[in-house]
UniProtKB/Swiss-Prot annotation:
Family as reported in the entry's similarity comment: Belongs to the KRTAP type 6 family.
Function statement: In the hair cortex, hair keratin intermediate filaments are embedded in an interfilamentous matrix, consisting of hair keratin-associated proteins (KRTAP), which are essential for the formation of a rigid and resistant hair shaft through their extensive disulfide bond cross-linking with abundant cysteine residues of hair keratins. The matrix proteins include the high-sulfur and high-glycine-tyrosine keratins.
Protein name: Keratin-associated protein 6-1
PANTHER family on file: KERATIN-ASSOCIATED PROTEIN 6-1, KERATIN-ASSOCIATED PROTEIN 6-3
GO BP, one annotated term: keratinization
Lineage: Eukaryota, Metazoa, Chordata, Craniata, Vertebrata
Organism: Homo sapiens
Length: 71
């Protein structure tokens, strides 16, 4: 599962939010920044690492604001 997306929503560089234990989030190929933003079934648009962040990652929420490649 992807847990919750509170971490990304508020832009906190945390862990165990979107993707952790599910799609990975930061560095894993499917995490936020290297593929599908949070990958929580929705808002999977890639974010932060070369893709932007708010604009692509679910209307400003999903992967922080400014960067979505938190490890």
């Amino acid at each position: 599962m992807c847990g919750s997306y509170y971490g990304n929503y508020y832009g906190t560089p945390g862990y165990g939010f979107c993707g952790y234990g599910g799609l990975g989030y930061g560095y894993g190929g499917l995490g936020c920044g290297y593929g599908s933003c949070c990958g929580c079934g929705f808002r999977r648009l890639g974010c932060g690492y070369g893709y932007g962040s708010r604009s692509l990652c679910g209307y400003g929420y999903g992967c922080g604001s400014g960067s979505g490649y938190y490890y």
